C-alpha cells in the first residue's frame, strides 16, 4: 500500500510538472556586439575627444536588460575586438604583463560567448592565445581547424539552457584569412569553407545536442567580398539560405547594419561597428506537443549613442584609462606643417607620401604602394603625440618588399584607380567613383569602394587619365629619379603586409599574380609593425615638414581640376 502511494504521488507530480511545462512560455533576449575595434571607453584616444557609443554605454543598456530578463539574456560578441584603438595596442604589445583589456571588458559585462575576427588573428598567436586564456567565456570557431589534431582550434559551439530551453551558439570566422595575413600569424591553423562546416555542425546540434534553438555567430559579412573556387569571404547570406536548421544568425565583419528575415524564416542581424549599435533578437518559445517551439521572433538594431555612460563601468576601468591616456599623450616630435587625409583622394598628398617615404627609406625599394588608412583625419602643425601615430597609420601592418614586373606595377595601379575614380565622359561628370548608398563604417562616406584599397605609388612619375576606360587610365612616365621605367623589368616594391598577402586583391586580380605565388614574391618582411618604424622616424627627425611628392596627377587637368573641387565639396561638405 505504501509503495502504491509513492508511485501514485510520483505519477501525480510528473503529470503536474508536464502540465506546467506544457503551458509554459519562455521569452529570451539575445544581444550581439560586433567589430568593437577597441571602443571600450567613452573617449577616442586617437582624436583625444569624447567618443559616441562604446562599451561604456552598452553596459548601461545591458544593466536594464538584465533587470528585465535575468538569466534569459544571452550576450554574444562577434570578434574584431583586439585592434582599432590605442587601447588595444597598449594592451596587446606594451603592457603585456596584465590581462588583456579586451578580455577584462568581456568578463566585466558577463558575455556568454566570443568569436574570432580577422583583426584578432592579425595580432598573432602570443596576443590572441593569451586573450583566449583570460576570457571567462568560450571563444568559438567551428571552421578554425588545428592542423595537428584536425579538430577545431577553439570550441566549435556553446550549449546553454535557459528555463528548460536548450540553445546552441555556433561560431565561425571568414575563411579568407590567408588573403590578408601571413601564415606566421595563424600557424597551425586552417580555415574551412563556411557552408559545409555549418551543415556538419548544425546536424550535430539538432540531433545529438537536441538544441531547441540554433544561433549562428559569424565573423563574415552578408555577401560579396573575396570569392574563390574554395570559399567566400562574406558567406552569411549563403549559409542562411542553404543550411537548414538556423533560427537566428548574428554576423559582422562588413561594418554594415543589417536586419532581415529570409523566406525560410532565418532572422539575420548585423549591428555594424564600434559599439555604436547592438543587434538584438527576442525569441518567444512555447512547450507544444512535447517539445519547445518558437512562436515569435523579432530582430532589432538598437542605437546605443543616446544611452548614458555607465559610471560604475568607467570607475572599474579607470586605472586602465589613465595608463592609456599617459601612453597616447607622449610627445614624439614636431610637425612644421599640417596634413589631412582628405588631400590623398584628389592627388599626390603629404599624408600618404610621408608613409611612402618611410617605406622607401626602410626597404630601399624602387617603388612604394600606399593607401590612406584613415578616411577623414588631420595631423596638425605643432607637437605630434603618440595618438597621432594612429591617425597616420591605423593598423598593425608590417612593411613588405615584393618582386614585381613593371607591367604588374601598372596593372596593380589600374585596379586601384578603377576602384577609386569614375570614367568621365563630360566635363560635368564626377571624377570620384561615388554612390548614393549611405555607409556608416567611417571608411567610405560617399565612395563606392573601401578607401583603404586606393593605392597610389611613389618612386615613379605617372598620370591617371580619367577619360580613359578602366584598365587604360594609368600611364607611367619614368622613375622619379629620371631612370626609364620598363614594363618587362623586375623591380622591388614596398607595401604593407595586408596588401602583400593579397588584401584588397590588387596584387591578384589587378597585377595578375596567382594567390599561391605571392609568398615566393616576398623578399622582405619587417620584424616590427609599421607604426613602430613611423614613430622612430619622427623621433629621429624631430622637426618634420611632410611634403607632397607631386609625382602623379589626374588628367586632363581642364576636366580634372574643376571636378575635384566639386567632388571634394560634395564628400567632405567643404
Give the predicted meaning of each segment.
Residues 21-306, 346-358, 368, 526:
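Acidic, metal/ion-coordinating pockets
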Residues 1-24:
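Bacterial Sec-dependent N-terminal signal peptides
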Residues 12-13, 45, 90, 415:
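Alpha-helical transmembrane segments and their juxtamembrane interfaces
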Amino acid at each position: 500500500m505504501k509503495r502504491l502511494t509513492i508511485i501514485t504521488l510520483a505519477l501525480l507530480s510528473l503529470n503536474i510538472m508536464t502540465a506546467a511545462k506544457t503551458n509554459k512560455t519562455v521569452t529570451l533576449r539575445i544581444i550581439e556586439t560586433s567589430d568593437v575595434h577597441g571602443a571600450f571607453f567613452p573617449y577616442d584616444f586617437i582624436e583625444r575627444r569624447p567618443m559616441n557609443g562604446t562599451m561604456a554605454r552598452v553596459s548601461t543598456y545591458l544593466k536594464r536588460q538584465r533587470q528585465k530578463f535575468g538569466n534569459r539574456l544571452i550576450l554574444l560578441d562577434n570578434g574584431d575586438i583586439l585592434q582599432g584603438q590605442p587601447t588595444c595596442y597598449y594592451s596587446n604589445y606594451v603592457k603585456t604583463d596584465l590581462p588583456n583589456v579586451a578580455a577584462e571588458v568581456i568578463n566585466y559585462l558577463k558575455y556568454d560567448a566570443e568569436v574570432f575576427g580577422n583583426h584578432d588573428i592579425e595580432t598573432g598567436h602570443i596576443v590572441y592565445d593569451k586573450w583566449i586564456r583570460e576570457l571567462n567565456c568560450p571563444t568559438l570557431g567551428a571552421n578554425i581547424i588545428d592542423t595537428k589534431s584536425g579538430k577545431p582550434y577553439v570550441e566549435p559551439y556553446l550549449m546553454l539552457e535557459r528555463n528548460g530551453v536548450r540553445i546552441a551558439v555556433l561560431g565561425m570566422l571568414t575563411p579568407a584569412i590567408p588573403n590578408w595575413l601571413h601564415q606566421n600569424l595563424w600557424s597551425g591553423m586552417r580555415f574551412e569553407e563556411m557552408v559545409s562546416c555549418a551543415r556538419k555542425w548544425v546536424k550535430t546540434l539538432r540531433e545529438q545536442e537536441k538544441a531547441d534553438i540554433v544561433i549562428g555567430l559569424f565573423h563574415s559579412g552578408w555577401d560579396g567580398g573575396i570569392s574563390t573556387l574554395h570559399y567566400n569571404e562574406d558567406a552569411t547570406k549563403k549559409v542562411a539560405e542553404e543550411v537548414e536548421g538556423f533560427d537566428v544568425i548574428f554576423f559582422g565583419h562588413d561594418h554594415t547594419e543589417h536586419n532581415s528575415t529570409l523566406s525560410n524564416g532565418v532572422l539575420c542581424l548585423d549591428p555594424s561597428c564600434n559599439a555604436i549599435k547592438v543587434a538584438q533578437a527576442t525569441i518567444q518559445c512555447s512547450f507544444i506537443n512535447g517539445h519547445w517551439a518558437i512562436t515569435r521572433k523579432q530582430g532589432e538594431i538598437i542605437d546605443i549613442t543616446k544611452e548614458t555612460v555607465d559610471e560604475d563601468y568607467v570607475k572599474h576601468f579607470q586605472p586602465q584609462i589613465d595608463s592609456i591616456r599617459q601612453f597616447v599623450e607622449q610627445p614624439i616630435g614636431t610637425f612644421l606643417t599640417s596634413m589631412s587625409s582628405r588631400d590623398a583622394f584628389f592627388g599626390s598628398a603629404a599624408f600618404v607620401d610621408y608613409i611612402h617615404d618611410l617605406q622607401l627609406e626602410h626597404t630601399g625599394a624602387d617603388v612604394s604602394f600606399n593607401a590612406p588608412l584613415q578616411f577623414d583625419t588631420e595631423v596638425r602643425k605643432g607637437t605630434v603625440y603618440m595618438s597621432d601615430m594612429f591617425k597616420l597609420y591605423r593598423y598593425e601592418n608590417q612593411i613588405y618588399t615584393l618582386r614585381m614586373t613593371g607591367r604588374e606595377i601598372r596593372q596593380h595601379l589600374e585596379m586601384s584607380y578603377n576602384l577609386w575614380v569614375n570614367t568621365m565622359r563630360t566635363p560635368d561628370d564626377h571624377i570620384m567613383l561615388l554612390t548614393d548608398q549611405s555607409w556608416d563604417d567611417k571608411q567610405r562616406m560617399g565612395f563606392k569602394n573601401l578607401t583603404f584599397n586606393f593605392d597610389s605609388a611613389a618612386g615613379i612619375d605617372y598620370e591617371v587619365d580619367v577619360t580613359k576606360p578602366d584598365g587604360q587610365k594609368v600611364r607611367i612616365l619614368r622613375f622619379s629619379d629620371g631612370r626609364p621605367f620598363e614594363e618587362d623589368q623586375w623591380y622591388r616594391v614596398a607595401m604593407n603586409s595586408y596588401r602583400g598577402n593579397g588584401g584588397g586583391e590588387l596584387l591578384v586580380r589587378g597585377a595578375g599574380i596567382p594567390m599561391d605565388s605571392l609568398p615566393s614574391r616576398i623578399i622582405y618582411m619587417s620584424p616590427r609593425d609599421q607604426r613602430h618604424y613611423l614613430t622612430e622616424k619622427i623621433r629621429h627627425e624631430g622637426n618634420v615638414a611632410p611634403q607632397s611628392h607631386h609625382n602623379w596627377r589626374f588628367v586632363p587637368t581642364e576636366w580634372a581640376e574643376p571636378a575635384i573641387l566639386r567632388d571634394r565639396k560634395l564628400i567632405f561638405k567643404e
